[in-house]
Amino acid sequence: MHLFILAAAALLGLSAAQHNPHTKHGRTAMVHLFEWRWADIAAECERFLAPSGYAGVQISPPHENIVINSPWRPWWERYQPTSYNLCSRSGNEHELRDMISRCNNVGVNIYVDAVVNHMCGASGGEGSHSVCGSWFSANRKEFPTIPFTHWDFNDHKCRTGSGNIENYGDADQVRDCRLVGLLDLAMEKDYVRGKVADYLNKLIDMGVAGFRVDACKHMWPGDLSAVYGRMHNLNTTWFSGGSRPFVFQEVIDLGGEPITSREYFHLGRVTEFKYGAKLGTIFRKWNGEKLSYTKSWGEGWGFMPEGNALVFVDNHDNQRGHGAGGASIVTFWDPKLHKMAVAYMLAHPYGVARVMSSFRWDRHFVNGKDQNDWMGPPSHGNGVTKPVPINSDQTCGDGWVCEHRWRQIKNMAVFRNVVNGQPHANWWDNQSNQVAFGRGNRGFIVFNNDDWNLDVTLNTGMPGGAYCDVISGQKDGGGCTGKLIQVGGDGRAHFKISNRDEDTFVAIHAESKL
Ligand code: QV4
Ligand code: CA
C-alpha cells in the first residue's frame, strides 16, 4: 500500500506537491501583510496570527531594491530588484531570519513574494541607490552583487520597437520583452536559472514554506519548471521530510489573451483574478449581478479547477488601480462590502484563500485615476517604514489598516478552519441578494445584500443548540457578545437581518456553540 502511494506520487511528478500550502494545526487562510517590517510580522505571528488561527503570511519582496525618490519611495520600488541581498525597507537578513523562525515556531507559514522576471527599470540609472547600498548599473545592465551582466538579459530576443511589451496578444513579446521598462532576465540561460534558484533556496533553507511568484505571465512555463525543479525541499526543522515548497503564480487571466492560467497549472497554484473581479461586481450589484447567482460559485463560474486556485477579494495592485480587475474590486475603502465579500470567500470551499492587509494612503482621484496610487507604506521623513502600533481595542494605528484583525474577518478565518473539508450544503436564496449556505454540519452563513430586511427560517444542517453569531460579536465565556441564534432539533433556525444593521450577515459554527 505504502509503495503504491509512493509510486503514484512519483507518477504525478514532484510539481503536484507544489500545490500544497503545508498549513499546520488545521489552519487554512493566509494574510498578505503588505509592506510590513519583519520585526512586526514576527510579533504579529506570536501575538495575533497563531492565536487567531491564520495559517500563513505572504510577505513583501525581501530582496534589495532600487531607491526611487520621484515619486518619493513608492511601494512599487520593491518590485525592482538590484541584488538578491536580503535587505529592504522591511528589515535586514537577521531580522528576516528571526521572523521566519518565530512564525514557524507558532505554526504560521511564511510565503515570499519572489520577483524573478526582471531587475530594476531600464531608466534606473547607475550608482549605489539601492536600499542597502549595493552598486548597480541599469544603463549597462550590471548587477555585480549577484552577479548579472548584460548577457543575462533578454533584449536580443525581444522584437518590439521600444523593447517593452507593446501587445499582450503576442505571447513572445509578453515573455521576452520588458514589462513596463523593467530589465527582463533571460531565464532560458542555465546561469540565470541557477542564480534565481540560489536565491529561492536560501529562503527555503531559512524556513519559508513557499513563494508567490511575481509576473509569471512574463516567464515561459518551461523556464519556471526548470527553476522550480532546482528548489530544495522545505526545511525539516518545521516541515516533514520531502515537502515541496508551495508555489502560487501571479498570472492575470481574465480571458481574451493568448497566455492563459492553464499553462501554469502543473507547476503550482495560480492566482484566480476572476474571483475578486466577479465577487466585487456581485456585491456592488453592477451589471445586473445578484448574490443568488453564486449558487454555483467556483468552477461553475468558469474559474480554474479548484485545486489550482489561489483566491482573494483584492490584492496590493488592484486595490489601487494597478494590474487588473478595475473598479469593481472591493477594498477596505468600502468596509461594509469588503467584510461581506471576504466572509463569502472564507465561508466558501473553493481555493486557497488570501486576506489582504493594507496601509492607508491619501487617495486623490482626477478623472477617475488615483494620483496617489504610488504612495508607500506609513513611514518617517527619512523613508524608514513605521512600526505597526496596536491600539487597546486590538486595531492598528499609524495608517496600518489591518483588515485581518477586524472582528468579522478574523472570526471568518476561524470559521474556515472549523468547516475545513466539509461540503458546501443547504443552499438557500431569495432569487435576489439574500443567500445562505452551510458547510456540512459544521457551519452556516446568511447574507442580506438587498435593500430590505431578511426574515426567514432556514435549514442549517447544524446540530440543535444555541450558537453565537461570530459577525455581530462572538462567544465569550458562557454567552454571546452579539446575536444569539437558536438552532432547533430539526436543524432549522430563524434569521433576521435588517438591511440597516452594521453588518448585514450572520455566521455560526461548531465552535461558536454555547
Ligand atoms: C515607466 C513607464 C514605461 C517605461 C519605463 C522606462 O511607464 O513605459 O518603459 O518607465 O523605464 C513602475 C512604474 C512604471 C515604470 C516602471 C519602470 O509604475 O510607470 O515604467 O516602474 O520604472 C509594480 C507596479 C508597477 C511598477 C512596478 C515596478 O504595479 O506600476 O512599475 O511594480 O516598480 C501586469 C503584469 C503583472 C503585474 C501587473 C501590475 O502581468 O505581473 O501588471 N503585477 C506584478 C506585481 C506588481 C508589480 C509587477 C508585477 C512588476 O503584482 O506589483 O508592478 O514586478 O498585469
Ligand atoms: Ca520575461
Q: Which functions belong to the PLM regions below?
A:
Residues Q18-D40, V180-D184:
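Boundary/entry segment of secreted carbohydrate-active catalytic domains
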